[in-house]
Amino acid sequence: LEGIPLDYILNTSSFLDFTFYVDPRVLIPRPETELIVEKVIDFAINKNAVVLDVGTGSGCIAISLAMLRPDLKIFASDISSDALDVATINIQNHQVNNMQLIKSNWLSYAKTESLDLVMSNPPYLKSDDRHLKDLAHEPQTALVSPKGTKSFLEISQQAFIALKHEGRIIFEHGFSQRLEVTAILKDCGFKNIISGQDLQGLDRFIYAQKL
């Protein structure tokens, strides 16, 4: 058991005020990721808005939002069947009924102008990132993206098509990636691009709007 994160040993992890089942098929939720849910709550999006969590993993982001805003229609996608199995356990544990899981590569299933909000904590570490050695027990496909920013480009391109007018997108990103992700969002056509910091004061999330 040496080196195995305690959350995997106990099969439980805390996120916001909720507890989630986790195992090595999914990432362990991070405190900084809670900021995505908190910011989405701040958006005060309309009742019955359609939301997609891209690369849902354990489902902690989508399920937390589903419980805090039961009036929303929430979808959560992942390419990993293993991750979707874990997310299914968490949906059942929390008895969430305003959420649906979809096996999909990013937003490939989404129809044009069908979504009000896209949120994602995608893979954003480069394959040579020095932090990976400390994350050896976690699924590398959920951590690593070519060049570190390829996932942001692919999701942003697809999201711009899938979002309705005035729809929003929000990402968690690495602390040194703000300028790169800002440029990607701008190149994809997004406006009102705003960045935010985590509790340590590091650039950690960014959101934008389709206008």
Predicted regions and their residues:
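Conserved SAM/SAH cofactor-binding pocket of Class I
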Residues: L35-H131
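Active-site beta-alpha loop architecture of Rossmann-like, nucleotide-cofactor-dependent enzymes
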Residues: D7, L125, S176
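Conserved Class I SAM-dependent methyltransferase catalytic core
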Residues: K147-Q209
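Short glycine/threonine-rich catalytic loop with a Thr-x-Gly-x-Asp
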Residues: P29, G57, L199-L202
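Conserved AdoMet
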Residues: L1-D42
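Short amphipathic alpha-helical segments
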Residues: T88-I89, R130-K133, S156, T182-I184
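Conserved beta-strand segments of alpha/beta enzyme cores
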Residues: T19, K73, N98-Q100, K191-I194
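Mobile active-site "lid"/loop adjacent to the S-adenosyl-L-methionine
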Residues: P122-S151
